[in-house]
């Protein structure tokens, strides 16, 4: 009897293994490219006619370009951790910069790996040691990978196992500060090849700062082109799904760590010749927590019960369909103490700031940049617009409300305008419902500033951590999705 049971169990395991191998053989390869500190409107395909991104522009032309993809945080590791888990930052247990993800959560590359994918990460990796289990291969040595982290992309593509589909998480350091002394790809003339964002002042220093930033994006762009050439050479381009996106807005005042569109709206391009018709645009509202369940569905893998996002795979075939009504985002500690929350619909944006007494000039790399110094110098002479002054404003509004259709740059706070009373109340209600359902809590002791907001010098509180948002309700164990 025991021998019969053993034979049955062996047969079941063989059949199960065979099914996984068969499913994996038919599944698409997936390449997820996540740029570092790149704004949505700093790509040619999104309307920037100064920056040189021919390969990303072609990727968009060959696939599907999303115009309303929103991150859950405009902060490096919290944003990436949110994508990896399909959860809001306060639900990951890693809502603050450089906080490691806990072991009890599932990471979507891990589920792909279990389904038979060869899983690899190249480049930036700071989501914590527990995520190591999600990858067969980690190539994170910056010296070996090159200054931007892209030198190993094609080497990995050539060396991968050829008998299974692959998932690559490609995380270049481009375009994170400090800028590389030399970059591959097209260069940008500060005088003629720059579109100065309205949040910055147009000075020689700002233009040079932006030129270095543009050069790093163009370097990344060049490697995207070389990667696609290698896919074609190997004859696997047709069934390889490529995504290009970014973790947060540009590392300049007014973008990175901000809850405006300049901070959390992100480029999102998907190319998959076998599954997506070329030359399409999707205007549906989507959250970055929706990426994990989408890629799992495409691969034929059931999402973990911990996932709060919803698959938008149907938009690959029908990009004209509506998806979300609301997207939510949060700003927690990133060099400086913070507790802000936002909810955005297609038409309106509402922001709640529990620490309005503080300014928000961005993290230290942004607020100590040449562009920030140019802003401060211009303010001293009394020459800033509303948008330019916003990064230096103190105190800030406790609430902000913008009409995205009439005011796309989000310059006029309408929270006190009676004409918008119903819309303000609706988004207030949605934000509270989201916080209640997902277990978001305001810490009694926020992680303090690690640097002086004006000088950038380390404070006495450097390296000290406070309470994580959501910790009081154990939000990392709450799986409710909140309003959709």
Task: Give the positions of each predicted feature.
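A glycine-rich phosphate-binding loop feature that marks nucleotide/adenosyl-phosphate handling sites
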Residues: 447-451
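Formylglycine-dependent sulfatase
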Residues: 2-13, 20-400, 408-436, 440-446, ...
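A contiguous binding-surface segment within folded domains or other stable secondary-structure elements
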Residues: 403
């Amino acid at each position: 009897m025991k021998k019969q049971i053993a034979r049955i169990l062996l047969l079941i395991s063989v059949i199960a293994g065979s099914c996984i191998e068969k499913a994996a053989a038919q599944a698409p390869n997936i390449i997820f490219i996540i740029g570092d500190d790149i704004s949505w409107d700093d790509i040619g395909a999104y309307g920037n006619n100064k920056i040189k991104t021919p390969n990303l522009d072609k990727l968009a032309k060959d696939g599907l370009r999303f115009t309303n993809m929103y991150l859950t945080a405009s902060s490096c590791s919290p944003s990436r951790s949110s994508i990896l888990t399909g959860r809001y930052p306060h639900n990951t247990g890693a809502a603050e910069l450089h906080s490691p993800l806990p072991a009890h959560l599932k990471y979507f590359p891990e589920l792909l790996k279990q389904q038979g994918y060869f899983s690899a990460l190249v480049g930036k990796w700071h989501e914590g040691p527990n995520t190591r289990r999600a990858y067969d291969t980690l190539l994170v040595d910056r010296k070996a990978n090159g200054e931007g982290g892209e030198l190993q992309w094609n080497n990995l593509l050539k060396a991968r196992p050829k008998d299974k589909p692959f998932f690559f998480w490609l995380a270049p350091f481009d375009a994170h500060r400090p800028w590389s002394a030399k970059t591959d790809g097209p260069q940008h003339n500060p005088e003629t090849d720059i579109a100065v964002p309205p949040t910055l002042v147009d000075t020689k220093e700002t233009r040079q700062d932006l030129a270095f930033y543009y050069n790093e994006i163009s370097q990344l762009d060049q490697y995207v082109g070389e990667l696609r050439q290698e896919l074609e050479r190997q004859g696997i381009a047709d069934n390889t799904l490529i995504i290009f996106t970014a973790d947060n807005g540009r590392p300049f005042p007014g973008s990175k760590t901000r809850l405006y569109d300049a901070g959390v709206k992100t480029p999102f391009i998907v190319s998959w010749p076998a599954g997506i018709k070329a030359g399409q645009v999707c205007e549906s509202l989507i959250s970055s927590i929706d990426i994990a369940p989408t890629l799992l569905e495409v691969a034929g893998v059931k999402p973990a019960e911990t996932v709060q996002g919803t698959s938008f795979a149907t938009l690959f075939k029908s990009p004209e369909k509506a998806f979300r009504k609301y997207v939510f985002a949060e700003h927690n500690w990133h060099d400086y103490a913070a507790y802000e929350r936002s909810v955005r619909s297609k038409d309106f944006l509402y922001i709640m700031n529990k620490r309005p007494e503080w300014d928000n000039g961005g993290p230290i790399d942004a607020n100590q940049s040449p562009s920030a110094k140019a802003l401060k110098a211009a303010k001293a002479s009394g020459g800033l617009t509303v948008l330019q002054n916003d990064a230096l404003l103190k105190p800030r509004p406790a609430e902000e409300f913008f009409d995205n259709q009439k005011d796309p740059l989000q310059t006029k706070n309408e929270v006190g305008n009676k004409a918008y009373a119903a819309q303000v109340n609706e988004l207030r209600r949605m934000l509270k419902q989201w916080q209640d359902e997902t277990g978001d809590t305001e810490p009694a002791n926020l992680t303090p500033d690690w640097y002086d907001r004006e000088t950038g010098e380390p404070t006495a509180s450097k390296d000290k951590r406070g309470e994580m948002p959501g910790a009081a309700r154990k939000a990392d164990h709450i799986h409710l999705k909140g309003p959709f």
